[in-house]
């Protein structure tokens, strides 16, 4: 160094020392980009600051660490283009350490090898070629000026102008600050006047001009979504918005909703009643009274689904019934149920029933699949769906055999079974005069409610085995061969074929099995779960008759009981 920097510059340089220590730290972390600019500002402060900066960087370049050498070389390369001219002049005079760095080497690293030494040598060569190149442009002797602040207020330079609303910078126009200020105010006033003054190009004033000085509220474009009556419109009238009525003392300032139905006006007049009945009359959303809904809700409903309009339901039914396949896929069924939850389910069901008449077989099958999807969803009660679909499904089921007939029958049986309204099937082997036969009591499993006049509690009729009757008559065990008593299948065959002998055998069974005090024997239910178990006959003694059995019973009851000696001595006394 030719000259020693003054003490003032050295003290000023000490405040910037933490920046340099962070930029030339001995680690593999690269130097942050913002530190390059801060170090370049140090070189532009003064000549003494440039000397102190170069002295510090050369001392760090003389370090044995490769990471420090690489960081210092990159900083010096950046200062060649952004540093002061005095710093570059001093650096050219002290380039011995840069030449030594071009031959930097050392023991290879176990992980990276010689890559660090190669980077240091390459950076030193780039710095030397850049520092002593003749094509290097001379950097400015002063630091770059800070850009003027942007925003409201005056700029920090002479002949400045205001910035902000209504200001447009004109480079060709010159003048004093007062003239610029006045022109700015004039242009701002013109902008405000053009925004307020109604003109032919203003889209907000294309409606009819106001008559007189009376106040007319502004009309928003959202009023065009209303549904006016075509009969009340003039031929040349445009679909505009009706005038908004103001009612003081109401919520929201007393202004009516623009796109609400006429019922919203009634609800605004009777807002107290609507608040009282709103919680209890949410179910009546289709009514037009307006006392149970708020104006916003009625406006949304009137805009979404106008009254007597099922266009969305009709589009959904058309989408479902018109498809390439006969059956609905799982995705189509899920989409149909999701859309039905947002629409009127009863209207969708009625439209599906209409599709079953006069359409192709494919459309009928898809409509039936859509109707069947109501059985697996909670959109409508099963009883209500059965009530609406029963007649149509019965007519389809009674038609010519085919896939449509089978599908309609299955759906009808499914709804009847889910509602518990399936009628019991009659047996094919019943006699024509079986209507006159005594009807058996309701079975405990098939009919949970007992029939009127029947006994509620089950009581044994006699000690003997009771063989119940059924509408199908069967002979007594005495008329059957012994082999038939062992095989129940043969007994059933014999029972079906021996209908002529049924009356006599029934009388025999009543005389032998039924006690005398039982006036009305209880037959077996035809729909019982235990039907057929009476075919397994109980073995009886053929030599005994009913009179012998009664005599034996009387003897048993009349004989005195024989007391046996007890194991306890005090009981035998």
UniProtKB/Swiss-Prot annotation:
<feature type="modified residue" description="Phosphoserine">
    <location>
        <position position="400"/>
    </location>
</feature>
<protein>
    <recommendedName>
        <fullName>AP-4 complex accessory subunit Tepsin</fullName>
    </recommendedName>
</protein>
<dbReference type="GO" id="GO:0044877">
    <property type="term" value="F:protein-containing complex binding"/>
</dbReference>
<dbReference type="GO" id="GO:0005794">
    <property type="term" value="C:Golgi apparatus"/>
</dbReference>
<feature type="region of interest" description="Interaction with AP4B1">
    <location>
        <begin position="526"/>
        <end position="536"/>
    </location>
</feature>
<dbReference type="InterPro" id="IPR013809">
    <property type="entry name" value="ENTH"/>
</dbReference>
<feature type="compositionally biased region" description="Pro residues">
    <location>
        <begin position="137"/>
        <end position="150"/>
    </location>
</feature>
<dbReference type="GO" id="GO:0005829">
    <property type="term" value="C:cytosol"/>
</dbReference>
<keyword id="KW-0472">Membrane</keyword>
<feature type="domain" description="ENTH">
    <location>
        <begin position="8"/>
        <end position="141"/>
    </location>
</feature>
<comment type="function">
    <text>Associates with the adapter-like complex 4 (AP-4) and may therefore play a role in vesicular trafficking of proteins at the trans-Golgi network.</text>
</comment>
<keyword id="KW-0963">Cytoplasm</keyword>
<dbReference type="GO" id="GO:0030662">
    <property type="term" value="C:coated vesicle membrane"/>
</dbReference>
<keyword id="KW-0333">Golgi apparatus</keyword>
<feature type="compositionally biased region" description="Basic and acidic residues">
    <location>
        <begin position="294"/>
        <end position="303"/>
    </location>
</feature>
<keyword id="KW-0968">Cytoplasmic vesicle</keyword>
<comment type="subunit">
    <text>Interacts with AP4B1 and AP4E1; the interaction is direct and mediates the association of TEPSIN with the adapter-like complex 4 (AP-4), a heterotetramer composed of AP4B1, AP4E1, AP4M1 and AP4S1.</text>
</comment>
<dbReference type="InterPro" id="IPR039273">
    <property type="entry name" value="TEPSIN"/>
</dbReference>
<dbReference type="InterPro" id="IPR035802">
    <property type="entry name" value="ENTH/VHS_tepsin"/>
</dbReference>
<feature type="region of interest" description="Disordered">
    <location>
        <begin position="497"/>
        <end position="526"/>
    </location>
</feature>
<feature type="region of interest" description="Disordered">
    <location>
        <begin position="194"/>
        <end position="311"/>
    </location>
</feature>
<feature type="region of interest" description="Disordered">
    <location>
        <begin position="136"/>
        <end position="155"/>
    </location>
</feature>
<feature type="compositionally biased region" description="Polar residues">
    <location>
        <begin position="217"/>
        <end position="229"/>
    </location>
</feature>
<dbReference type="InterPro" id="IPR008942">
    <property type="entry name" value="ENTH_VHS"/>
</dbReference>
<feature type="region of interest" description="Interaction with AP4E1">
    <location>
        <begin position="563"/>
        <end position="573"/>
    </location>
</feature>
<dbReference type="Pfam" id="PF01417">
    <property type="entry name" value="ENTH"/>
</dbReference>
<keyword id="KW-0597">Phosphoprotein</keyword>
<feature type="compositionally biased region" description="Low complexity">
    <location>
        <begin position="260"/>
        <end position="293"/>
    </location>
</feature>
């Amino acid at each position: 160094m030719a000259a020693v920097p003054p003490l003032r510059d050295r003290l000023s340089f000490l405040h910037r020392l933490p920046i340099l220590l962070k930029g030339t730290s001995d680690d593999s972390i690269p130097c942050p980009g913002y530190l390059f600019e801060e170090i370049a500002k140090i070189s532009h402060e003064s000549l003494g600051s440039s000397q102190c900066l170069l002295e510090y960087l050369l001392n760090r370049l003389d370090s044995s660490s490769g990471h420090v050498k690489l960081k210092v070389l990159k900083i010096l390369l950046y200062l060649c283009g952004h540093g002061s001219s005095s710093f570059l002049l001093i650096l050219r005079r002290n380039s011995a350490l840069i030449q030594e760095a071009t031959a930097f080497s050392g023991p290879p690293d176990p992980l990276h090898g010689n890559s660090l030494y190669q980077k240091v040598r390459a950076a030193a060569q780039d710095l030397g070629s850049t520092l002593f190149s003749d094509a290097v442009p001379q950097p400015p002797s002063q630091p770059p000026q800070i850009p003027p602040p942007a925003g409201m207020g005056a700029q920090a330079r002479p002949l400045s102008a205001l910035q902000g609303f209504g200001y447009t910078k004109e480079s060709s126009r010159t003048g004093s600050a007062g003239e610029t200020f006045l022109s700015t105010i004039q242009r701002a006033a013109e902008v405000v006047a053009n925004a307020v003054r109604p003109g032919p190009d203003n889209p907000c004033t294309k409606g009819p001009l106001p008559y007189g000085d009376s106040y007319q509220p502004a009309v928003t474009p959202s009023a065009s979504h209303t549904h006016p009556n075509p009969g009340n419109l003039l031929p040349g009238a445009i679909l505009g918005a009706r005038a908004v009525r103001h009612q003081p003392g109401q919520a929201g300032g007393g202004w009516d909703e623009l796109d609400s139905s006429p019922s919203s006006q009634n609800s605004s007049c009777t807002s107290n009643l609507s608040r009282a009945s709103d919680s209890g009359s949410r179910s009546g959303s289709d009514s037009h009274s307006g006392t149970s809904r708020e104006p916003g809700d009625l406006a949304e409903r009137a805009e979404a689904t106008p009254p007597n309009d099922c266009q969305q339901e009709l589009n959904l039914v058309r989408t479902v019934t018109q498809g390439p396949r006969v059956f609905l896929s799982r995705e189509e069924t899920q989409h149909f149920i999701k859309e039905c939850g947002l629409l009127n389910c009863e209207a969708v069901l009625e439209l599906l029933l209409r599709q079953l008449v006069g359409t192709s077989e494919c459309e009928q099958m898809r409509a039936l699949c859509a109707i069947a999807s109501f059985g697996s969803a909670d959109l409508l009660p099963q009883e209500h769906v059965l009530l609406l679909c029963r007649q149509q499904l019965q007519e389809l089921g009674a038609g010519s055999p085919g896939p449509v007939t089978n599908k309609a029958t299955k759906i009808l049986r499914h709804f009847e079974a889910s509602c518990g309204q399936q009628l019991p099937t009659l047996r094919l082997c019943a006699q024509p005069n079986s209507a006159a036969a005594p009807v058996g009591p309701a079975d405990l499993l098939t009919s949970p409610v007992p029939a009127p006049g029947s006994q509620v509690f089950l009581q044994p009729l006699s000690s003997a085995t009771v063989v119940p009757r059924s509408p199908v008559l069967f002979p007594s065990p005495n008329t059957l061969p012994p082999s038939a008593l062992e095989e129940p299948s043969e007994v059933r065959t014999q029972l079906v074929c021996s209908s002529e002998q049924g009356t006599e055998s029934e009388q025999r069974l009543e005389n032998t099995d039924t006690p005398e005090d039982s006036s009305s024997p209880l037959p077996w239910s035809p729909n019982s779960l235990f039907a057929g178990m009476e075919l397994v006959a109980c073995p009886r003694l053929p030599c005994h008759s009913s009179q012998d059995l009664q005599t034996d019973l009387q003897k048993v009851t009349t004989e005195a009981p024989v007391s046996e000696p007890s194991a306890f001595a005090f009981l035998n006394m």
